Amino acid sequence: MKKEEERIIVIGDIHGESTWMDIVEKHPGCKYIFLGDYCDPYNHDLSDEEVIANLCSIIEFKKQKMDDVVLLLGNHDIQYVYNEAERCSRRMAHVEEQIVNLFKTDISLFEWGRKVENIIFTHAGISQGWFRFASDKADKHDIIKFITDPQNKEVAFACGYARGGNAIHSGFFWADKRELTEPLEGYIQAVGHSRVPEILFRKITEDTVIFFCDCLSMGKYLIIEKGGDSIQFYSALLGEDKSTLLYTFHL
């Protein structure tokens, strides 16, 4: 295993779960990227108070480690922040005002996407079809600038048929796994949104790969390590010391 500072821990959709704390405790001193969807729990045993307290803890964790923690917004989050966003199941609509205030107070701590080396992190993923749709405005070689520009809300927030919307191609907050059979060419992606039983990945070419990471509820997460002339991607499970190598990308 490489030095801790060369390791990125990718944490899938939260939905009120505090499992992320155990992952951080297991992997101290790393970089941490949260893929979004902090509220609206699927676990009905979680109270509103627990979910909100968990979001507050995540925000505080970011404030304590500004350079080491990335908080991405998901489709369940943007609906509380932007009027233009498509609405999805608001399991916490009765405390909406409190959630809106939390996000808006610290919105500067949240991002739409992040790029590290040739790896792009977004909530749901970028399809080649969506890129072609948006290509009159986007340069693939400067894609991160485009996807983090709030002026591009219309295409970014697009919700396709697979998730109940009307857009031909979903944007990177809504893209379903079924829409990502052709992910953005020339990049490796790590995304959440589409629930999977474990870390799954789809390889198109050596440099066009997408990892699906929405399996935090199963205690599973992605580890990315850079060492020498390669980047390695591991699947990890809480409660187990050994991680499983999934893919090696040679720089």
Language-model segments: which ranges?
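Beta-strand-turn-beta hairpins that frame and shape the catalytic cleft
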Residues: M1-I9, R114-F121, T208
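Conserved beta-sheet core of the metallophosphoesterase superfamily
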Residues: A175-A236
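Active-site-proximal loop/helix segment associated with metal-binding centers of metalloenzymes
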Residues: H94-E97, E111, K115-E185
